[in-house]
């Protein structure tokens, strides 16, 4: 399927045509006004919708049936759209964790370009969560263990509209406790960075072009977390979401006693803070409305579980 790196009015019209919808029907499908659709289509490739609408369009294409996707591919030439930069996805196996059911992707052992200076560094094989741990995911842990829920959950229950948003208001110890319960770990700084940048040391998950529209950062004006599968065009070479923006992510790597590294930036962060090679850390007891996590697992350990061997 053609992957739209940056939507313009031209691709929007192609999607509506592929879906065989009128302007009124298409506007209702996206949850925007008819006037907005007409404006986008009239201006064609000269207009780029706001990041929140880019995400809506990504989702509309992703959720379309195969016939619609095929028609869209034909209308757009089947190539990367809008001349935007992209990097080749890395073929790797995806699995569902046997305990939590969360989708994880394998990152094969290899050298990658680490840190701001792109230092070659070997990292053994591991799996990493494709998505951030959501409120719904974390609720299973709270229910199973009696662990204290995040402070913004009313009466110990997360707001229903935030079910698929990343869990926040968690300390490093909260995140580590979840990972242990799930039979996983928190990723190290090296594991996280490799999953974000690929083996060739791209500046961002999608390549070297600074494109804030591909992630949830302050410049986009979203002003809150977004669902964990929102920014498809901003995924990493391994297909991992939200490696730039949405929430800062706790990592296993200790910077100094009592402090742990975080990466990825957040909806509260300026875009330049979301660069995956950048360093950030915080006290293990820190928690905020822009800090969450995802999990990882050593390849051998997870594959033993998957194959039912000890």
Where do the PLM segments sit?
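Short, charged recognition helix plus adjacent turn
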Residues: 68-93
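Conserved hydrophobic/aromatic packing and binding residues within compact polymer-binding modules
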Residues: 12, 26-27, 37-40
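DNA major-groove recognition helix of helix-turn-helix/homeodomain DNA-binding modules
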Residues: 49-70
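A short glycine-rich, aromatic-capped structural motif
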Residues: 95-152, 169-173, 195, 245, ...
